[in-house]
Amino acid sequence: MAFLEVEHLKYRYPYTKKLALDDISFTAEKGEFIGIIGENGAGKSTLSQAFCGLVPQFYKGAYGGKVTVDGIAAATTPTAELCKKVGLIFQNPFNQLSGAKDTVWDEVAFGLENFGVPAEQIHERLNKVLHQLDIWQFREKNPFDLSGGQMQRVAIASVLAMEPEILLLDEPTSQLDPQGSEEVFHTVELLAQTGITIFMIEQKMEKLASYCDKILLLHEGKQIAFDTPEKIFSRPDLAELGICPPYVTRYCVEQHLFRPDGTYPVAVEDVKEALKRDKESKVTLPQLADTVLAEAPENRFDVRNLKFSYTEDHPIFENFQLSLDQRPTAIIGQNGAGKTTLD
């Protein structure tokens, strides 16, 4: 028996006619890293909630088929018991954090305390996960004083501290900057190597292609495919299904570069190998055209010597200077850099 089995799973929310999940079947083993993709409304979040018993125990409705986790039926096992095996991380950390604790340390320890984990073990687990997710320096801060990305890492740490055997992540990097996203993917990959089964719902196809062992493709509640990233992203119908493949794959489609098995590469390393095999291919880099710079427009927005801090010991802006004209301007920076505060 596989560690997780989904057999002909069907589900319809109350007061609706359309199935949110329509005959889903697949298996997963310990330590597999599986991505779940599909356009909005495909059933991704509903499926993840079925893994941990929220569907149908909390979200009522018409339920059929079976989800089994290590021999335990997810639909009938109390969620309080099932959460020891299956951890779910929401897209929005506001929906995950308890609000009952004033510090990051206490928030991450909250679930462990509820299950009566000894204090010594709690300290060991918290030391581990807070360093893993690079939030050790925030351990004495209130979680709701952190940026969105930092809060998400606290939410992830709270679940990881429970040491689940299956980890479900519902777009966990949606509020993280590129560096934070890479850290989360790398951390989750390491967790998979320790034997934790990972299911990650994501829109960042490049990341999924690089990290996942398999990908589950859903469309309008139906299972379209369950296969390797190379085979999934080589499908000719992805655009019709609302999926944009990784840039590397799109490039290889244009250049007619293939892997030995006939699929398109999804990683840069595979592209290099494909280029070596295709001696006739000629790859040309785009040339920068001569650009005539127009005279800079007049400034319409000026910031001079801006100073601001939420607390006395943590300034957000210190002698900040900025001049803008009518041209569009992007504001970028790591989580906590001050982007939202400036806005």
Q: Model-derived features: where do they sit?
A:
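Conserved beta-strand-loop-alpha-helix hinge in the C-terminal portion
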Residues: 222-249
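H-loop/switch region of ABC-family ATPase nucleotide-binding domains
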Residues: 202-203
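Conserved ABC ATPase "signature" region
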Residues: 109, 113, 120-138
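The feature captures the beta-strand-to-loop junction immediately N-terminal to the Walker
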Residues: 37-39, 332-334
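Catalytic Walker B motif of ABC-type/P-loop ATPase nucleotide-binding domains
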Residues: 167-170
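Conserved ABC ATPase signature
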Residues: 142-146, 150
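Conserved catalytic motifs of ABC-family nucleotide-binding domains
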Residues: 163
